[in-house]
C-alpha cells in the first residue's frame, strides 16, 4: 500500500467522523422548561422575535441554542407527533378519567 492510498483512507475516515458528529433535529431530546421559563420565553418572543440571545439573557442558565431548539420543538408541526407521544406517555401512570355518573342506565 503506497502513501496516496493511506492518505485517501485517512481523509475518508475523517469525513465519516465529521458526518457522524452532526445531530439531526429528529434525534433532539425534548427540553423541559418550567412554567415561568415558558411564560417568559413566549412574552420575550412577542417583544423581540427570534433574537434567541436576548431571550436567553433573561432566562437564567439557558443558552440561546437551547431556547431556539425548545421554541422549534414546541411550535413546529414536524414535532407534533413527538409532543403527543411525550404527553401521552407522561399520563400513563395517572388514573384514567372516569365520569361521576354513567350515561347508561344500570
Curated annotation (Swiss-Prot):
List cellular component terms (GO): nucleus
Q: Where is the composition biased (Basic residues)?
A: 84-100
The listed locations are: Nucleus
Conditions for induction: Negative autoregulation. Repressed by CPC.
Which biological process annotations from GO are given for this protein? Answer: fruit development; regulation of DNA-templated transcription; regulation of trichome patterning; trichome branching
Q: From the UniProt record, list the coiled-coil ranges.
A: none
Expression across tissues is: Expressed in roots, leaves, siliques and inflorescences.
The Myb-like domain covers 34-71
Q: Which GO terms describe its molecular function?
A: DNA-binding transcription factor activity; transcription cis-regulatory region binding
Keywords, ordered alphabetically: Developmental protein, DNA-binding, Nucleus, Transcription, Transcription regulation
The answer, when asked if Transcription regulation is one of the entry's keywords, is: yes
Annotated region described as Disordered, given as residue ranges: 83-106
Q: How does it assemble?
A: Interacts with GL3 and thus prevents GL1 GL3 interaction. Also interacts with BHLH2.
Protein function = Transcription factor. Involved in epidermal cell fate specification. Negative regulator of trichome development, including endoreplication, by lateral inhibition involving intercellular interactions. Promotes the formation of hair developing cells (trichoblasts) in H position in root epidermis, probably by inhibiting non-hair cell (atrichoblasts) formation.
Relay the record's extra comment.
'Triptychon' means 'triptych' in German. This protein was called 'triptychon' because TRY regulates the branching of trichomes in three branches.
Q: What is this protein called?
A: Transcription factor TRY
Amino acid at each position: 500500500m503506497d502513501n496516496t492510498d493511506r492518505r485517501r483512507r485517512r481523509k475518508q475516515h475523517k469525513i465519516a467522523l465529521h458526518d457522524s458528529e452532526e445531530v439531526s433535529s429528529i434525534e433532539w431530546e425534548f427540553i423541559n422548561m418550567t412554567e415561568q421559563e415558558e411564560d417568559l420565553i413566549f412574552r420575550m418572543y412577542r417583544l423581540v422575535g427570534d433574537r434567541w440571545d436576548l431571550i436567553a439573557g433573561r432566562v437564567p442558565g439557558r443558552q440561546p441554542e437551547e431556547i431556539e431548539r425548545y421554541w422549534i420543538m414546541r411550535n413546529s408541526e414536524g414535532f407534533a407527533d413527538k409532543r403527543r407521544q411525550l404527553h401521552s406517555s407522561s399520563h400513563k401512570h395517572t388514573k384514567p378519567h372516569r365520569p361521576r355518573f354513567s350515561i347508561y342506565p344500570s
